Swiss-Prot record:
It is found in: Nucleus. It comes from Oryza sativa subsp. japonica (Rice). GO terms for cellular component: nucleus. A motif (Bipartite nuclear localization signal) lies at residues 150-166. This is Putative squamosa promoter-binding-like protein 19. A zinc finger (SBP-type) spans 90-167. Zn(2+) 2 binds at residues 134, 137, 141, 153. PANTHER family: SQUAMOSA PROMOTER-BINDING-LIKE PROTEIN 19-RELATED, SQUAMOSA PROMOTER-BINDING-LIKE PROTEIN 4.
Length: 352
């Protein structure tokens, strides 16, 4: 019992010494001092007391030091909080007498030190002067720098208006390139109406220039007449076609067809491809009795609804069609035409 009481006293004394050593930062010296004090007791009791004191010192160093450092951490946070409070004072609204908490406002208002209400107020007092917050500069300006009813200062509005008034959209406006746009009278698509060019006509036909005119077809019929090769069914017609399409086998076949050019003035025969040949014949085998008739139709000019058609020559081809007993023949006048810009007409007549 005495030994246990002594050990308890030594342990309590060692803890007290450890606490004092922690306060004075002399822990190791206290341990060296605690050893001789227990010389009156047994060696086992002294060893137990020393072990208890060492354990108590270890627990104190593990638990007490972080606990002592915690207030410093709190002070640092408090300092930051105080700094935040000071910063909150620095980030407070710049308007005199405004105590709005900017920590609940947007970052824009915190950065420019103005609350949301005073950012839109027409007149506020800042540092004893009546000012207004500019929406574009994000700063307070004197009232003289604002126009009536404007939320931005005059300097920023002038630059903004100059940028907006630049005529950039007119050069790139797609409506100006459309054919139906009335402001600009031009079109991307050119007009495709053909126009007669007198110079081009002179280059194509330097020896044969005639004023352009339209052609109208007019027929004069006395009575309907059937050709002999059309009355014997289909055999005569087929034979006639075959005979008309075959090449000339003798000079007599070619002698019955003649081409006259009454309007080709001064053009050589070899340079006139527009004189057509008519191969209408009444018999399969032409006879010498069949005459050759050449006629020239005088040009008759009349208005026409046909547009852009011109006759480059008035050459006609006359083919004699005989029914076997008559001497006078039936002839057809066929003008050779090309497509140009005409204003007058040339007749197409069928005479029987």
């Amino acid at each position: 019992m005495e030994w246990a009481a002594a050990a308890t006293k030594a342990a309590s004394w060692g803890m007290a010494v450890a606490a004092a050593a922690a306060a004075d930062d002399a822990g190791p010296t206290m341990l060296s001092f605690a050893g001789p004090s227990s010389s009156s007791s047994s060696p086992d009791a002294a060893a137990a007391a020393a072990a208890a004191a060492a354990a108590a010192l270890h627990d104190f160093s593990v638990r007490a030091r972080p606990a002592a450092a915690a207030p410093a951490t709190r002070r640092a946070r408090g300092g930051s909080g105080g700094g935040g409070g000071g910063g909150g004072g620095a980030e407070a609204c710049s308007v005199d007498g405004c105590r709005s908490d900017l920590s609940r406002c947007r970052d824009y208002h915190r950065r420019h030190k103005v609350c949301e209400a005073h950012a839109k107020t027409p007149v506020v007092v800042v540092a004893g002067q009546e000012q207004r917050f500019c929406q574009q500069c994000s700063r307070f300006h004197n009232l003289a720098e604002f126009d009536d009813g404007k939320k931005s200062c005059r300097k920023r509005l002038d630059g903004h208006n100059r940028r907006r008034r630049k005529p950039q959209h007119d050069a790139l406006n797609p409506r100006s390139f459309l054919p139906y746009h009335q402001a600009n009278q031009f079109s991307v698509y050119p007009q495709t109406f053909p126009i007669a060019d007198q110079n081009a006509d002179a280059l194509m036909r330097p020896l044969d220039r005639h004023p352009p005119f339209s052609i109208s077809f007019s027929g004069t019929f006395r009575e309907p007449k059937q050709f002999p090769f059309m009355q014997d069914g289909g055999s005569g017609l087929g034979a006639a076609r075959h005979d008309l399409l075959r090449p000339f086998s003798s000079p007599e076949d070619g002698a019955n067809i003649t081409t006259t050019r009454s309007a080709c003035n001064g053009v050589p025969h070899g340079l006139d491809p527009e004189c057509a040949l008519s191969l209408l014949s009444s018999s399969l085998h032409p006879s010498p009795a069949a005459g050759i008739s050449s006629a020239t139709a005088p040009p008759q000019f009349a208005p026409s609804s046909f547009s852009r058609i011109a006759a480059s020559s008035q050459a006609v081809t006359t083919a004699f069609a005989s029914d076997g007993g008559s001497v006078a023949g039936d002839h057809v006048l066929v003008p050779a035409v090309t497509y140009e810009d005409p204003s007058q007409a040339m007749p197409f007549s069928w005479q029987v």
